[in-house]
């Protein structure tokens, strides 16, 4: 949903380094998603929000605005899928970058096939999920 770009830009102009489109806050939605995908993305986002210091409720949505400063300073290691979005979120949270979210509506594609490869991407997602949790629980600072 590209209609939210203006709102994302406003958040960026207010000092945010990451502005995340969120399906799981008031005004956001996720429609037509396969059951297993829905359970996985909701569970990961819910637990990261409540068990870590990551300040957004939709950690797995890759539709985000990133500041140039962030992209110049944070090394992206992820090689598969949308793992980069979780990686950047976890690393930037450790570095105390300002992270905000705005509501977004998301609908499963009606044409073509999904590029979501859960079993292929899961190891990378788990790596950055644990990295995000360790920021809070193990007080790790190393990037």
Q: What are these model-predicted stretches?
A:
Residues 2-82, 108-119, 123-127:
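Acceptor/aglycone-binding surface of glycosyltransferases and processive sugar-polymer synthases
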Residues 46, 50, 95, 136:
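Phosphate/oxyanion-binding loops and surfaces in catalytic or ligand/nucleic-acid-binding neighborhoods
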Residues 56-58, 96-106:
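Catalytic beta-strand/loop signature of glycosyltransferases that borders the donor
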Residues 67, 92, 102:
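Residue-level signature of catalytic and energy-coupling elements of molecular machines
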Residues 84-91:
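Short active-site alpha-helical segment characteristic of glycosyltransferases
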Residues 93-94, 121-122, 137-138:
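Juxtamembrane/interface motifs at transmembrane-helix termini
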Residues 128-143:
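C-terminal, non-catalytic tails of nucleotide-sugar-dependent glycosyltransferases
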